Amino acid sequence: MNKIRFLDKYLVQKIAAGESIDRPCSILRELLDNSIDSGATKIEVFLEEGGIQKILIIDNGSGISKEDLKICYLPHTTSKISSEEDLRKIETLGFRGEALSSIAICSNISITSSTTSNESYQIEVENGIEKCFKKQPAINGTIVDVTKIFHNFPARKRFLKQEPIETKMCLKVLEEKIITHPEINFEINLNQKLRKIYFKESLIDRVQNVYGNVIENNKFRVLKKEHDNIKIEIFLAPDNFSKKSKRHIKTFVNRRPIDQKDLLEAITNGHSRILSPGNFPICYLFLEINPEYIDFNVHPQKKEVRFYNLPFLFKLISDNINNFFDKNINNYQDIIIKRQLTEDDHLIEMTNQPENFNKINTYDIPQNNNLETEDVNEPNKNTTQSNIDLRRYNSIIQNRPTLRENIGNIFSDNFLEFEEPPNKNEKEEIKFNYIGQIFSEFLIVEKINEIYFIDQHAVHEKIIYEKLRNSKKNVQKLLVPIEFTVVDKNIEEIIDSEIEEYKQMDIIISKIGPKKYQLESIPNICSQYENTLINFFQSRRSRTINSLESDLYATIACRKAVKRNDMLSAEFSKFLINEFFKLEIKHCPHGRKIYYKISKFELEKKVDRA
């Protein structure tokens, strides 16, 4: 007796229905896709009990003819493709011919439609079987009424959530369709009550209308780019808005919501220099790509897509977002929302400082040869605090270069070709009141009824980073090439893939053997940092989020900047603060916030004076 047998046709249809229809929101998605594909300019949606009891869709689209209505619920019937060639350039939301047949198998469905103004027809289907077909008064478009969802799928029905959760899932589907089709009027009704009407509008107005509350009704910034067969439109939140999850990163490809890890990473990467680790951007990406270069025939619900050239697309998105923030960092005025302090916020308690406070706070440029490996954040844990203090003050009096020499060392021609900070008569003075340095880590500044607590390492790091990026660069060939090796195959593959990019940065690397390379030429701005470069190459365990150039400059800036526990002179501190305000610095090259500020009013409120 044969163990392998043909399945019953009805059973096959039930299995297929279970793949594409798993809950009411799946039915809603398929019906909305059909309405949109029909060219509708108005869609009315009625949901009862989260779609569990009833889903009713009314549209003014092109309608379904009498002949097509008789077969539209059968498996693999569709008006959207007719050949394999059509599958290679899909321009509609639906194309498989599975939606209506799957819905008809797991529920009762009634479809009333017309293609003329004279008459319409209605078909009623239960459990995939036609029960009624009749003539009806003329309507403009199509009405689809779905009831008794999963009545013949008891296991599936048991796993449905409570009404509020199913409603929320349906609203999420509606949101995806509303946001991607601003040219359509949508009317949403829940449990026979009007919930919301969205009128025809531009995409930017629709995004602002739907998602504006996420950024407290501030305005999104819009980035538009076109490249060959790709159009990109990205809606970016102001810099001061971020989230602790990726929930507000949404990607749409040819008006479809797509869950694509690579696109999410590209967006996150583009924001990397303005967001600290653990924070994610608020961003909505809309891609329009020639259908011949993408494949939607991957996932039953079309939530995934294959791209013809994903690495190029990844770089295009990431680099454009990065460049957008670079260009706007100095001229875009953020709308700052006044942050109300919570009871958990702590103000740094300031004590009266002695008159010679600023005179004691001098900064000694590190002169050791271990600059590349110096710990940025923590002193040696085995060293007591008293030893740290003693060593710090000893460094001030033992053969210390003058402050003027120190500043000259940082910004002289032989270091990164930085101009020396202009003197007081030449430089752009910004009015502020420097209060002092605390914890050997933060600079405190008063400016226009606000107090700033500025991270000294982060602000100096950002200043150096910006100077590096904007400085004139010349190639410098090493008299003796520096050989180095890498520890594993993964790093070797990454360096091999990046060699051409290094050449564009005037960094010439040659491979001289398995896992062995030699550094032959470098830009003049890196002339003192060969060891930093080598360490940078040897730590490339993955392609990082920024461009190679940004990664490298961030590494050099981090090594060169003043550190925590460095004592700074008043003059040098004021120089950093002036640059901080002049450049409107907000984040370090790694995305961490550089400062915290509190207004006079907030401070007075904290001590019950307001």
UniProtKB/Swiss-Prot annotation:
The keyword Transmembrane helix does not apply. Disulfide bonds: none annotated. Keywords: DNA damage, DNA repair. PROSITE patterns: DNA_MISMATCH_REPAIR_1 (PS00058). The keyword Mitochondrion does not apply. CDD domains: HATPase_MutL-MLH-PMS-like (cd16926), MutL_Trans (cd00782). It comes from the Bacteria. Gene3D superfamilies: 3.30.230.10, Histidine kinase-like ATPase, C-terminal domain (3.30.565.10), MutL, C-terminal domain, dimerisation subdomain (3.30.1540.20), MutL, C-terminal domain, regulatory subdomain (3.30.1370.100). GO terms for biological process: mismatch repair. GO terms for molecular function: ATP binding; ATP hydrolysis activity; ATP-dependent DNA damage sensor activity; mismatched DNA binding. Coiled coil: none annotated. One of its GO terms (cellular component) is mismatch repair complex. Pfam families: DNA_mis_repair, HATPase_c_3, MutL_C. HAMAP family: DNA_mis_repair (MF_00149). Belongs to the DNA mismatch repair MutL/HexB family. This protein is involved in the repair of mismatches in DNA. It is required for dam-dependent methyl-directed DNA mismatch repair. May act as a 'molecular matchmaker', a protein that promotes the formation of a stable complex between two or more DNA-binding proteins in an ATP-dependent manner without itself being part of a final effector complex. NCBIfam families: mutl. This is DNA mismatch repair protein MutL. It comes from Borreliella burgdorferi (strain ATCC 35210 / DSM 4680 / CIP 102532 / B31). The gene is mutL.
